[in-house]
Amino acid sequence: MRCLSQGIFQEIFRTPIRRIGAFAGCALLAASCSNTGGTSPTGPSGPPPAGSTIVYTAVGASDATGYGSSVVCVPFFVDCPNGTGYVQVAVRALQSQGYKVTVRNMGEPTAVIGQDFQSLGQQYGRIIAFNFIDREMPFVLTNSTLVTIFAGGNDVNVITAALGGGAGGNDPLGFIDAQIRAFGADYTTLLSGIRNLAPSARVIVLNVPNMAGLPYMAGDSLQKRQAAQRAAVGMTTQVVNPLIGQGATIVDLMCDGRSYVPSNYSSDGMHPNDAGYAFMASELLRAITSSSYPSPQTSCGPMTVVPNP
């Protein structure tokens, strides 16, 4: 996977047309490897045997490319040995422990989980070029032994943008709750599709941190932060964390205090920097290699960084 400095990456994705064109070409490369597979309601669990081969597909948005870090990786290419995002740091750590790792990084900037969130975001002025279900799930490596999924951050931003544009009318809380349910339906489609394509893959999911507690929202109105909190906490507690009952391992970003340390974020206040991605990679590595990884917390202080309405 080819690596780019932060400045070069920003130049490539400076305009929507160039962003779409660059990644459309990458998607065509991925499409040349068609995927078929069987069905599996749940996936395997437990760590890979020491020294074994790990075939890893990372499903995500710009976070999977390491956007905000010092070395950002362009998706779909073969190798990114110096990348400083959580995917790349975790891969190097696995290799240092003797694992042989093959990676397909599906991370696409601006991506949301499904077409419904993509359309909603575009309706309210957000640039969203991709979604996980249509543009990432079909290209999961069928021989994957590990799939990681990190969805929700961009989706929360779609919800708050829609509310800011008048969506929800006199019932904004009802609108948020409806979007949480839609996110859950999309997650079911995404996870089912991944397991159909890659039935031997262990699935590790990173839950959604409370976006209201991230630096990029510090200057926003209380109402907007309350909406972001309701959406993020709902996505995590109602959609992502229950996936543990379907055999997924959950990395609990929501309740990890490191998710809210300002020094772990890049200048945009939303994407982690090298330090932030390093902590994410350390938790991902522990989830991959541990025979017993803790379940996500059902409640914690970070779920209420602002008072609920």
Regions found by a protein language model. Give the residues of each.
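Conserved SGNH/GDSL esterase-like catalytic core that processes O-acyl groups on lipids
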Residues: 68-185
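A structural motif corresponding to the C-terminal end of an alpha-helix
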Residues: 91-99, 186-205, 234-252
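Structural recognition of the beta-strand scaffold that forms the well-ordered cores
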Residues: 55-66, 102-107, 145-150, 155-158, ...
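Solvent-exposed, polar/charged alpha-helical surfaces in well-ordered, non-transmembrane soluble domains
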Residues: 88, 92, 138, 158, ...
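Catalytic His-Asp segment of secreted/periplasmic serine-dependent ester chemistry enzymes
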Residues: 208-309
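N-terminal secretory targeting modules
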Residues: 1-101, 142, 291-309
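Active-site segments of SGNH/GDSL-like serine hydrolases
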Residues: 153-154, 163-164, 191-230
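Extracytoplasmic/secreted cell-surface and envelope-processing proteins
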Residues: 66-68, 115-116, 156-161, 213-216, ...
